[in-house]
Amino acid sequence: MTQATQLPAGENPVKNMTDLVTEIALALVDDPDSVVVEAIAEGDCTVIRLRVSPSDVGKVIGKQGRTARSMRTILSAASMKLKHRFSLDIVEMGDPSS
């Protein structure tokens, strides 16, 4: 038996996901003022770009990428429920390539 998931009226899944990533990142970093999260629509996917200070990149990525992988797993699970694909990019603040 499959049940359709519907968002309450007025819910914005992109804002909810950016808020989620922001809260997780703020709990991990030493410099919360440097955390910037933005959503970029790319076709059928929304890229959540997380910018943190250079000293906090390692904390957000974690040993062997475990923390970043966990954040991506959470996004993936929520993506399935929302029926919209999200991906997470973690970039260093001031990185000219982003």
Show the residue positions of the predicted features.
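Glycine-centered tight-turn and secondary-structure capping sites
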Residues: I61-G65
